[in-house]
A protein has these predicted regions:
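Reductase modules of NAD(P)H-dependent flavoproteins
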Residues: 5-114
Length: 114
């Protein structure tokens, strides 16, 4: 997002979801929330796609870079962000799911694709 005020789900993800009756335990073990802002000072700044390509994202969260043999991705965002992220994944050997219910290494939000 551009500004901290646009981190619409931050409180829910960080405060409410970990206490959720059914999802809380899973969230605590699996979910890594990495908010980044492009136009204000914040603990993580810049585009997420840049952080992926530079390796900064993985350095910050302490995980290995994305690997199509073990990772899957679900992408949503603006049309330009979707296109850029799909291109990154394609270059790294990920295969897009061709359609609803069809297997692939990643899926993206098709409602807003140009």
């Amino acid at each position: 997002v551009r500004e901290v005020s646009e981190l619409a789900y931050a409180d829910y993800i960080q405060k409410e979801l970990p206490r959720h009756e059914y999802l809380g335990e899973l969230v605590g073990e699996k979910l890594i929330y990495y908010p980044t802002v492009t136009r204000e000072a914040f603990r993580h700044t810049g585009r997420l796609t840049t952080a992926i390509e530079s390796g900064k994202l993985f350095e910050d969260i302490g995980l290995k870079p994305l690997d199509p043999t073990v990772d899957r991705a679900m992408i949503c965002g603006s049309p330009s962000m979707l296109k850029e992220t799909c291109n990154i994944l394609d270059r790294q050997g990920f295969e897009v799911s061709p359609g609803l219910g069809e297997p692939g290494d990643y899926v993206f939000e098709r409602a807003f694709v140009e």
